[in-house]
Each structure stands twice: as structure tokens, then as C-alpha cells.
């Protein structure tokens, strides 16, 4: 038997910028790869070790299976020994499918659906009364409970309010031995049967039996049982009991609301799925939202009059002598609407009439023509209804796009955003419907499920389901996601949240002997929750797995059993292992990471905080999601950090309320801002630029050079060469987006997409151009010995040397280098970029544009994927923006960014419903003094350990005296 390998050995790894790297990693340990951005960490972890694990797995499959998976390219290395089965957990969005939620991703929703289907209590969705189902024995017991001396009839319904004589049904019942009927409420004997009017509706019951309970309480159980069973058979599972001289009762073997006389289908797990026709709301098809015409987009400027174009789609018709304009004028005359009064000053009823129409009320219309006049009556449709009707009816793609500018997603009015049909929403467990429980946070949902008070039979059914739900929710809590709700849409999750959800799922699988490769699992996690994440990673290791983490977070590095530090620089200056060993030995190492960990290098804390321009942007009464009437002042001309534990409301405040509200006020943005009262101080700002982590493109044609417009200048340089002018080539010849210079086999992509049908599509290099994108004729043209394909293959740092004398190319390249992307290749396809890299490319593009000094920049966790030294460069870039008079708002957990900010807004105190308030605000020093702030607690220690800057920042105006941080509520 071969000896068991206790190490994973990699020799001669040369993928991307790796320089024949060799490492020996201990198995069953927590191993961290760290180093500057672009130094080769991911190239070894993902593109070599994980990729080879996947390739070997595919090679182990049958030839039949491999034909569907295609040939996976072998990474460049000499040999790898001791490789375990590999599982990758990356920072990718969980799903772009709007039907995907936290509950469906984690499978918790599947177990909840089973729970509601098996022990849920059905209520009538119309009257709210409990809906019950009774067996024949239970019906007999109900009848036995009637008072002594009660006389009653048992009846089965033959006809329920239908036209006709129905003689055939009556004859069939007579033939079966029944002698009495109840016709339209009157009990008649066989010889008294009337002739029914076939043009009228009738209700006919057959009398199954006439029964009585003795004065002494004697109950003829055997006879009643036979009659009940007969009646249920005759009445298709329903039986009426008419108390003589009293009321009537309906018993049913199926679910039935007696008050509304309505049946309900038997609940199944599919009845509670918004992805199944059996459960989804019929109006929104289970999405919970519908596109509707948005009044705020239709009337973007309420200071205008109707005649002056307040209603934007009607702006032109109001100025001309048009048919629509004439109708609006007639409506205005009929209802006394002043078309020359500002929209905001019109009475609410007049605004409602113009938007939603006359709601069926007819208006006399008159139109005069040269040949006479036309008179008629019609109701007024209203602008919103008219636009939506035309949007649904048009066949023109151009008109559809025009109408879509006035559409926004609105909560479905039928299901109120709950996604399920009314009958499904009326089933409760523990007094709550499934949508109500799905709206709880993970922590609250777990408490609810475990706290259910169930009967013995229900407990027996639910115990195993409760265990599964408890386990899954527990794992999510352990990775710091307790603030998420189960109905949170998958597309709204950040890359870090998605990664931790997948991590929680792997904990639940309890696999052993696996190599897990993780990409920065600490992204988006507050310092307070780091310990729980590290405990989860250790638990994964303790199952007998090897956990390999690519990480920059100080706590994660210090918790590692073994650390591999890459460097010394990025791109071609990296690709080497500069240290491999324990954390203690790394602190003594001369590498960049070692010097930052030991404190020999540090990002200094500014000696003074910028006071800003003296003007503020004030957001009042923000109430979106979990925000609790938050009002906040943002000093303009400063670097503002918005902080708080995960789920405290940071992204909601900035991305869901502030950014869209400012965009709408400044640029007429179409995104609907979250609920708030007012945004003041907009006049001090001229632009809002959101720099998020969404991809810069979704195809291989999109890359850093094209996005930043650097490639436009590069193409001009190639077009000016002697060879290009000789061949008559212009800049378009060097574009891979148009015919001429590109390879037509792949249409300039450099790769061909292979559709895998039931798997993700696979991209393979083009066989004609071998991934170079251009045809041979184009590649004849060279600049400084390089063709255009070779230029696109250059890292930014090398491109700076090549184009050192090209003033049109240099600015874009410099900004890419300044934001820490010097290692990126100019033509690196956008699908291969991380969220953090995409965000910094967007930042670089904005930096290369002229600044006005009155712009608000919004960044969401810009430190994603940044090493300590790259973070220092990023802070320098942000300082440049602020020093030019702009305002930078960052949502951030990284303590180095927070302590370097001029102003901090800390939300909390916890996540979910326990958050949504401002806990502290002010300078980092002021926030650090607030006892109730989790951020302040960690910030105190960070400020204590940090070194002050040698050169203090100069405020643009005298700084105000320090004020006490506001501990709760909102700023006044």
C-alpha cells in the first residue's frame, strides 16, 4: 500500500505570471495565500491547484461522459502530488435569477414548504375562517354532540343553483330508493314533486335520512354512520345537516369554507412554491413585483405646469393643436383643472385624475373640424393607464424602449409582494403564513421554527424537518449571515454574502478529505463577525479537509496554520513565493506582507481631519427596508465612511436611498429611491457617480483597455505607424468589434463559446487566430516591435513603458496603475475580473475624466481584493478626489479606511430589525468613544496602534471643535 501523503506538493507552476513556483502545503490545515494584488495567489490556488483537481475528476469519468464535458486544458506545471478532490467557493453572485432567494439557494425554503404542507392549518383567504376537513367518523361524533331531543335531516346535494328540469337526476335518486327531496329550500315527498321551470336556476338536495336524538340523549350511532357514509358518497364528499327548526350545517371530507361555501385543494409542497403554477401568484407569476408606470418618472419635474410639459410623455401634445391635447383640455374644463398651475400645487384629486383617469365616469367630448363637429362621450383613461396599454400593445421594439423609460418594478398589488396565491398565503403554522416566516431574518426564523408548539401527531411529522431547517439556519448564523431574510432575492446578494452561503452549505454536507479553495471569505464582514467566520473555517478543517484561502484580511492571516506569501510585487514583478511557513516566521520576513503584519510598515492615520467645504447634504426620514426614520448630515468635500455590522442598513442607506435620490434630482435617474422624506443640499452638487462591483462587461470583448477608452488611443497610435499608412489602415482596422481587421472565425472574441445545454457554457480558444482576435494582415503592423494583440497582452506597468511618449495613452494607463491594477493585462476579458477589480477599473476611468470639484462619488467596499500596500495606494487616490473638492462616500468594514476617513456614519446597533439606526457619527476619534458602537470598539484599538501621518492634511476651512458622537436616533 503506498504511503499516505500528508502534503500537497506543487512543482514548477507557471500559469499566468507564476515563475516556476514550487510549494509543499500541509494537508488538513488552514492554509492562507496572501500577497499584493496580482502577485499570483489566485493563479496558483484557482488556476493551477483547483483547475487541475477538476481536470483530473473529468479524466476519471467514462469516455461517454467526457464527450459532454469537453477537453479541459491542463494548467502549466511540472508535477502535482497529493491532490485531493477540489471544491471552489468563489466570490460570485449567487444567481441573476429573480426567482432565486436565500431560502431557495440554501434549500431551507424546500423544508419550510414541506412543513406547511404537512402540518399547516388552512384558513379561508376571503373571510379568514378556519377551513376544516372531516372524516365520516368525525362527522358522526359532531352529530352525536347535538343536544338531546334534536331532530335533523341529512341531505346530499344533487344540483347547485343550475338551470334546467333535472328530471334525470331526480329519477335516478328515486330508483335508488330515496323518497324525499329538498327543492329550492322546500322539503317535498315523492308524490309532491313539482315540475321545474327549465329556464330558472334550482338547488336540489336528496334527503338521505330523518333522524333524532332521544330526549334521554340516546343516539342511533349505527344508523347515523350508515346515513353519513351514504350521504358523502351521494354528495361527492359533502353532507348537509338541516336542524329541524334550527340552522343548517355543512360537513365535508375535503377542505371547505362553510361561510363562503368554497372548497380548497389539498395542500402539497408545490402549493407553497412561487416557482410552481400550483403556488405562484397568477398576476405576477411568483415574482412579487410587476412593471408599472411610475408617476415619478412620468412627472419628473413637479415645478412645471401641465401645459408647460410637467407630464413628460404629453409634453409635445400640450404644445400643439393635437387630438390628445384637445381631450386633455376638455377633461380640464370638465373637472376644473388649471393646466397653467405648477403640478406640485394642483389638488391631489386633480393629479390623481390626470394620472389614473376618471375611473369610468363619462365625459362629453366635442371636436370641431372644417367639415363640421364630432360629439361623443367617453371615460378618460389617464396617462399611466394609457402608457401601459400602449406598451402592452405595441409591436415596435423602438416604441417599447421608449415606454420602458417610464416603467419601474412595483410591488404586485394582488399578492402584496408575497409571491404566492391567496389560498397558499392563508395556510398558517404557529399562527404565521409561509411568506411571513420567509420575511424574518435567519436568526428570527430559526427561533420561530424551534419554538413551535405542536401536538403529538404534528411533532412526529415535523421533528425531522425542524432538524434540517435548524442545521441549515445554524450554519448561516455561524458565517455571519443572521441578518439576511429568507426571501432576500439572490441577485441582491453581494459576492461575499454569496460565498458565505455556499460555505455554509459545505459545512452542512460534512464532507471529509476535500481540498476547499476559497476567495476572500471575509469580504463584507464586520470585524465583530470575523471570529465566527474563522471558527467555521476551522470546523471545515477539523472535518479532515484542507482549507486553502486566498485572503488579505489580517485576522484570517494570523489565524492560519500555514501562510504562503507571494510577491515581491504584482504582475511581472510578482509570481514568486517570498515566504512559506508560520505566521510568526512571516512577521520576521522582509516581504511587504511581513512588514505590514509586524508593524514595520503601516498606513498612517491623518494627523488632522478635513473639515470640508462647510456645506452639507442632508437626507431626512429614510425608511427603506430596516432603516428607522434615519436622518443624516453628510459634510461635502470630505471622505465619508459609512460603517456598521453586516445588515445594519449601510447599503440600504447609501445605495437604495441616497444614490438614486441624488441621481434622480441631478440627472433624472430612473432608479426609484427608497422611502425617505427629503434630500436637501442638492444645489451644492453637480454629479453623482456610483462605482460598484458589477462587471464592466459580460463578454470576452470587454476588457480594461476598452472600458477606460485607452484602447481608442492605442488604435490611433497603430494607425499612425508607417506600415499602417502604407497599407491604408485606419484606427478601425485595429478594432475587434468591426469587420476588417478582426478574425472573422471568432468575430474578434479570441474564443468560441460552446453551448453545454445542461451545464455552463465553455469558452475555448479560436483555432484560426489562436486567441489573438485579429487576422494576420492586421498583425503585420507593429509599434515598438509589438503587434496590437501583443499590446493587449501587456500588463499595465509594461504598457506604461511602451507608451511613455504617447500623451493620449498615458493618462488612462497611469490611473489604472494608481488604483493598484498595474498587474492587469490591457486585454484581460471582463468575465475573468473579480468584483473588486471591476470597481477599481471604473474608478480609474472616472479619475481620467476632468473633475468639477462638486461631484459625489459612492463606492461599495472598494478594499475588496486589496493587499495592505494596495490599500495605501487606493487611499491616496481617494484623497486626490477629495482634495479636488469632491465628496467620497464609501461603505466599508476595513478599519484602515475607516480611521483614515474625515467623517464616519456608523449604523446599527445590530443587523436586520435590530439595526437601521445611526449609532454614532463624527470623526473616527469621536465614533471610537461611543460605547454602544461595535465599530467604535474596534476603531479604538486601531487608532491606538496606528502611526500618525508625518504630514497632516490641511483642512480647506477651520475645523469645528470636536463634538460628542450622536449615540442613537437621528441627527437633528
Regions found by a protein language model. Give the residues of each.
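Conserved phosphate-binding elements of NTP-dependent enzyme cores
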Residues: 1-972
Amino acid at each position: 500500500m503506498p504511503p499516505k501523503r500528508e502534503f500537497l506538493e506543487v512543482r514548477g507552476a507557471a500559469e499566468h505570471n507564476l515563475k516556476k513556483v514550487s510549494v509543499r502545503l500541509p494537508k488538513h490545515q488552514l492554509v492562507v495565500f496572501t500577497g499584493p494584488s496580482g502577485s499570483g495567489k489566485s493563479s496558483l490556488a484557482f488556476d493551477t491547484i483547483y483547475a487541475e483537481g477538476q481536470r483530473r475528476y473529468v479524466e476519471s469519468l467514462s469516455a461517454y461522459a467526457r464527450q459532454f464535458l469537453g477537453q479541459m486544458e491542463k494548467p502549466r506545471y511540472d508535477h502535482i502530488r497529493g491532490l485531493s478532490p477540489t471544491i471552489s467557493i468563489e466570490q460570485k453572485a449567487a444567481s441573476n435569477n429573480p426567482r432565486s432567494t436565500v431560502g431557495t439557494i440554501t434549500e431551507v425554503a424546500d423544508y419550510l414548504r414541506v412543513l406547511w404542507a404537512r402540518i399547516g392549518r388552512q384558513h379561508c383567504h376571503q373571510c379568514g375562517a378556519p377551513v376544516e376537513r372531516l372524516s365520516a367518523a368525525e362527522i358522526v361524533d359532531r352529530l352525536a354532540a347535538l343536544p338531546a331531543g334534536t331532530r335533523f335531516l341529512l341531505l346530499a346535494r344533487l344540483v347547485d343553483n343550475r338551470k334546467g328540469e333535472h328530471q334525470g337526476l331526480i329519477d335516478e335518486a328515486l330508483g335508488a330508493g330515496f323518497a324525499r327531496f329538498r327543492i329550492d329550500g322546500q322539503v317535498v315527498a315523492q308524490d309532491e314533486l313539482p315540475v321545474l321551470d327549465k329556464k330558472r336556476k334550482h338547488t336540489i338536495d336528496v334527503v338521505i335520512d330523518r333522524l333524532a336524538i332521544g330526549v334521554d340523549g340516546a343516539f342511533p350511532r349505527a344508523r347515523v354512520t350508515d346515513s353519513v357514509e351514504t350521504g358523502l358518497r351521494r354528495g361527492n364528499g359533502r353532507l348537509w345537516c338541516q336542524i329541524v327548526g334550527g340552522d343548517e350545517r355543512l360537513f365535508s371530507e375535503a377542505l371547505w369554507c362553510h361561510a363562503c361555501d368554497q372548497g380548497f385543494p389539498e395542500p402539497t409542497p408545490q402549493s407553497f412554491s412561487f416557482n410552481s403554477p400550483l403556488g405562484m401568484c397568477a398576476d405576477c407569476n411568483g415574482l412579487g413585483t410587476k412593471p408599472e408606470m411610475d408617476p415619478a418618472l412620468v412627472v419628473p419635474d413637479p415645478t412645471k405646469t401641465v401645459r408647460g410639459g410637467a407630464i413628460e410623455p404629453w409634453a409635445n401634445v400640450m404644445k400643439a393643436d393635437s387630438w390628445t391635447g384637445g381631450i386633455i383640455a376638455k377633461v380640464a374644463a370638465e373637472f376644473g383643472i388649471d393646466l397653467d398651475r405648477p403640478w406640485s400645487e394642483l389638488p391631489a384629486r386633480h393629479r390623481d385624475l390626470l394620472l389614473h383617469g376618471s375611473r369610468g365616469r363619462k365625459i362629453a367630448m366635442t371636436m370641431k373640424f372644417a367639415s363640421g363637429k364630432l360629439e361623443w362621450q367617453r371615460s378618460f383613461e389617464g396617462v399611466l393607464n394609457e402608457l401601459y396599454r400602449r406598451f402592452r400593445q405595441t409591436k415596435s421594439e423602438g416604441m417599447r424602449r421608449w415606454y420602458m423609460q417610464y416603467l419601474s418594478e412595483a410591488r404586485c398589488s394582488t399578492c402584496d409582494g408575497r409571491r404566492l396565491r391567496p389560498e397558499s398565503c392563508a395556510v398558517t403554522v404557529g399562527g404565521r403564513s409561509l411568506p411571513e416566516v420567509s420575511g424574518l431574518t435567519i436568526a428570527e426564523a430559526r427561533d420561530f421554527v424551534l419554538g413551535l408548539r405542536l401536538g403529538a401527531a404534528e411533532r412526529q411529522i415535523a421533528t425531522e424537518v425542524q432538524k434540517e431547517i435548524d442545521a441549515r439556519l445554524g450554519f448561516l448564523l455561524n458565517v455571519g449571515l443572521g441578518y439576511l431574510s429568507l426571501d432576500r432575492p439572490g441577485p441582491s446578494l453581494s459576492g461575499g454574502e454569496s460565498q458565505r452561503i455556499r460555505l455554509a452549505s459545505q459545512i452542512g454536507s460534512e464532507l471529509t478529505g476535500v481540498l476547499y479553495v476559497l476567495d476572500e471569505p471575509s469580504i463584507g464582514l464586520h470585524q465583530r463577525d470575523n471570529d465566527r467566520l474563522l471558527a467555521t473555517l476551522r470546523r471545515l478543517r477539523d472535518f479532515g479537509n484542507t482549507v486553502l484561502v486566498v485572503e488579505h484580511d489580517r485576522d484570517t492571516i494570523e489565524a492560519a496554520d500555514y501562510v504562503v506569501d507571494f510577491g515581491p510585487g504584482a504582475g511581472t514583478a510578482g509570481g514568486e513565493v517570498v515566504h512559506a511557513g508560520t505566521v510568526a516566521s512571516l512577521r520576521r520576513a522582509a516581504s511587504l506582507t511581513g512588514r505590514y503584519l509586524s508593524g514595520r510598515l503601516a498606513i498612517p492615520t491623518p494627523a488632522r481631519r478635513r473639515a470640508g467645504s462647510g456645506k452639507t447634504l442632508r437626507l431626512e426620514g429614510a425608511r427603506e427596508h430596516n432603516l428607522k426614520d434615519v436622518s443624516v448630515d453628510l459634510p461635502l468635500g470630505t471622505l465619508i465612511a459609512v460603517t456598521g455590522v453586516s445588515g445594519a442598513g449601510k447599503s440600504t442607506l447609501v445605495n437604495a436611498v441616497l444614490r438614486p435620490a441624488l441621481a434622480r434630482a441631478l440627472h433624472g435617474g430612473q432608479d426609484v429611491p427608497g422611502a425617505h422624506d427629503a434630500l436637501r443640499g442638492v444645489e451644492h452638487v453637480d454629479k453623482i457617480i456610483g462605482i460598484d462591483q458589477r462587471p464592466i462587461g459580460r463578454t470576452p470583448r470587454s476588457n480594461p483597455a476598452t472600458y477606460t477608452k485607452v484602447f481608442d488611443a492605442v488604435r490611433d497610435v497603430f494607425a499612425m505607424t508607417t506600415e499602417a499608412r502604407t497599407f491604408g489602415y485606419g484606427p478601425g482596422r485595429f478594432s475587434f468589434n468591426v469587420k476588417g481587421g478582426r478574425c472573422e472565425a471568432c468575430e474578434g472574441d479570441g474564443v468560441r463559446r460552446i453551448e453545454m445545454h445542461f451545464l455552463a457554457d465553455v469558452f475555448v480558444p479560436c483555432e484560426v487566430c489562436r486567441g489573438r482576435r485579429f487576422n494576420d494582415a492586421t498583425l503585420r503592423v507593429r509599434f515598438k516591435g509589438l503587434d496590437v494583440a501583443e499590446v493587449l497582452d501587456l500588463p499595465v506597468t509594461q504598457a506604461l513603458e511602451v507608451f511613455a511618449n504617447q500623451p493620449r495613452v498615458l493618462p488612462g494607463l497611469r490611473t489604472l496603475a494608481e488604483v493598484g491594477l498595474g498587474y492587469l493585462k490591457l486585454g484581460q476579458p471582463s468575465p475573468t475580473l473579480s468584483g473588486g477589480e471591476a470597481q477599481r477599473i471604473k474608478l480609474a476611468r472616472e479619475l481620467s475624466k476632468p473633475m468639477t470639484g462638486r461631484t459625489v462619488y459612492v463606492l461599495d467596499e472598494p478594499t475588496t481584493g486589496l493587499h495592505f500596500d494596495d490599500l495605501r495606494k487606493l487611499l491616496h487616490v481617494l484623497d486626490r478626489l477629495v482634495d479636488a473638492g469632491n465628496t467620497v462616500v464609501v461603505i466599508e468594514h476595513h478599519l484602515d479606511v475607516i480611521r483614515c476617513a474625515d467623517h464616519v456614519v456608523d449604523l446599527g446597533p445590530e443587523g436586520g430589525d435590530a439595526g437601521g439606526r445611526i449609532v454614532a457619527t463624527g470623526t473616527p476619534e469621536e465614533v471610537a468613544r461611543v460605547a454602544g458602537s461595535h465599530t467604535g470598539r474596534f476603531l479604538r484599538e486601531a487608532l491606538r496602534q496606528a502611526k500618525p501621518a508625518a504630514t497632516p492634511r490641511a483642512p480647506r476651512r477651520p475645523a469645528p471643535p470636536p463634538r460628542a458622537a450622536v449615540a442613537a436616533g437621528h441627527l437633528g
